Amino acid sequence: MDKLFLFDAYALIYRSYYAFIKNPRINSKGLNTSAVMGFCNTLHEVLTKEKPTYLGVAFDPHGPTFRTEAYAEYKAQREETPEDIRRAVPIIKSLLKAMRIPVLEADGYEADDVIGTLALKAGAEGVMTYMLTPDKDYGQLVRENVMMYRPRHGGGYETLDAEKVCAKYGIANTSQVIDLLGLMG
């Protein structure tokens, strides 16, 4: 069976950056390469261990999304993106381009919208699809042929199918994930 891996770029970049926050990786030019190194390590690990048939890396757009246009306060309380992450993103995109790995972006839509759309379509076509992200919100998308591939603290990954998502949150159906997370705040 064909395998598709969809990476949530910013979630993985942030995770990589903060994993090295106490001991950042600085190159000879003074550039903090923690996010680049962590992201590339994740990419290499997936390519060598999972050998996906298809792979795409989704990024959030630079401009507004349909959510910010509908509700101006959407994510307004978030802190500014650290400058080291801002510098890392073009480097990561350049590496992906050099490796001929598709960078997925859609004006007005967040990476999770792009991943959700592609994952559900591919899963319905019989492609085993893995959404690589630490973001719990993706649990609502898990179903037949669509799974979460979550990084574990301390290394490795956890593959979550619908049964595991439901057991993890004590719910009957993955469509309830969003309600549960909404109640949790």
Label every model-predicted segment.
Residues 22-26, 76-185:
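Extended two-metal-dependent nuclease catalytic cores across DNA- and RNA-processing enzymes
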Residues 61-74, 90-96:
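A short glycine/small-residue-enriched secondary-structure motif
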Residues 1-56, 60, 66-70:
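Non-catalytic, usually N-terminal nucleic-acid engagement modules in DNA/RNA processing proteins
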